[in-house]
Amino acid sequence: MKIIFAGTPEFARVALERLLAAGAEVPLVLTQPDRPAGRGMKLQASPVKQCALAHGIAVAQPRGLRLDGRYAEDAAAARAALEAAGADAMVVAAYGLILPQWVLDLPRLGCLNIHASLLPRWRGAAPIHRAIEAGDAETGVTIMQMDAGLDTGAMLLIEKTAIAPRETTATLHDRLADLGGRLIVEAMELAACGGLAATPQPAEGVTYAHKIEKAESAIDWKLPAAAIDRRVRAFDPFPGASTQCSAETIKVWGCEPLQVPPPEGAQPGEILQVDDAGVDVACGGPDGAAGVLRLTVLQRAGGKRLPVGDFLRGHPLAPGMVLGGGAGA
């Protein structure tokens, strides 16, 4: 069975590697154009492109796929390449471009998507982040038959996994990437023998995982400690949770909600205690939900992530200071 693969980041690279290791024939890979990255802002190929080139696979990088859109020439060239590949199916994983109907209709078996959630929960661009932010106890991967909607297609395979209490997007991403790679191999094996059954998504339980914006990084100390903790973990590694101390931005990479209420009269964001174990900060929230958040890993703008004891030696913090707002560093 010939498979066209469309994907861009590390999550997708893992799936492509799994398919190739399983013996899949992949004549063509679609991925996003090279982007400037790093301190020198030099053009860098996506992880999927790097993988494809390492395996001698042809790569197409259209800027768009709409034949009547802004990048019609790119779309026409991509269509010619897709038709020439003569694939039976397309596997899509975090590609980054909307697939128009002509793409969905081209492969004999259609387009299969690897989605990092238990659909219909967390349709959309950031299912891993939003699951952690919401405090979900479990998530998983769904292999979906793509249609014209936003992650609305029929479910082909689905597998659950628990979200660990201190899970971050970084750690959960890696586990789901591995799970997605295993499931897509299983799906293609079933498809080859006609054993892949489709189940429509239920109408109940639909939620949307909207794209993470850098502006979300600012910590709102009026939220309960547990909610802030979830956001810190959800926004690791991007965009990072941050707060202002005087005129300086500090990123918070590690924290722990303490099971104690803040002292009476403490305002949200007020530093209550400072030692090598952590910086304790008063949080807000409704009666009974307010608490104290202990900050354990911090980073100054342009610096490295540091355990709080090391951070304090170069950046003293003291009880009575008030943290607030924040912007991405």
From Swiss-Prot:
- Gene Ontology CC annotations of this record: cytosol
Alphabetical UniProt keywords? Protein biosynthesis, Transferase
Known catalytic reactions: L-methionyl-tRNA(fMet) + (6R)-10-formyltetrahydrofolate = N-formyl-L-methionyl-tRNA(fMet) + (6S)-5,6,7,8-tetrahydrofolate + H(+)
**GO MF annotation terms:** methionyl-tRNA formyltransferase activity
Report the sequence similarity comment from the record.
Belongs to the Fmt family.
Q: What is the role of the protein in this entry?
A: Attaches a formyl group to the free amino group of methionyl-tRNA(fMet). The formyl group appears to play a dual role in the initiator identity of N-formylmethionyl-tRNA by promoting its recognition by IF2 and preventing the misappropriation of this tRNA by the elongation apparatus.
What is this protein's record name?
Methionyl-tRNA formyltransferase
Which organism encodes this protein? Paracidovorax citrulli (strain AAC00-1) (Acidovorax citrulli)
Q: Which gene encodes it?
A: fmt
